[in-house]
Amino acid sequence: MNKNYNLSKIIFNDLISFYKTQLILIFMIFISALLIITIIHKTRLLTSQQEELDIIKKKQMPLNLEKYISTSRLKFKHEKIDT
């Protein structure tokens, strides 16, 4: 009369047979949470990369602006001489 029952197997079988929809919902919630976390992480990485690019562009802007101003002044001088 001394039978050994595997309690974890009994609980697992009961959960599958009686609480199938609840287990599916819990699994879907878990997957949804993981996807949200990965999307937020990737979005933050992209945002930080975009900010770094903006900083680099701002550092290069005065150089480009100076080149533009000097070339436009030269063009203006040439136009003055031509007329």
UniProtKB/Swiss-Prot annotation:
Segments in the Cytoplasmic topological domain: 1-20
Protein location: Cell membrane
Membrane-spanning segments: 21-41
Matching InterPro entries: Cell_div_FtsL (IPR011922)
Keywords of this entry: Cell cycle, Cell division, Cell membrane, Membrane, Transmembrane, Transmembrane helix
Extracellular topological domain: 42-83
GO biological process, one term: cell division
Topology relative to the membrane: Single-pass type II membrane protein
GO CC annotation terms, alphabetical: plasma membrane
Protein purpose: Essential cell division protein.
Family assignment from sequence similarity: Belongs to the FtsL family.
Name of the protein in its database record: Cell division protein FtsL
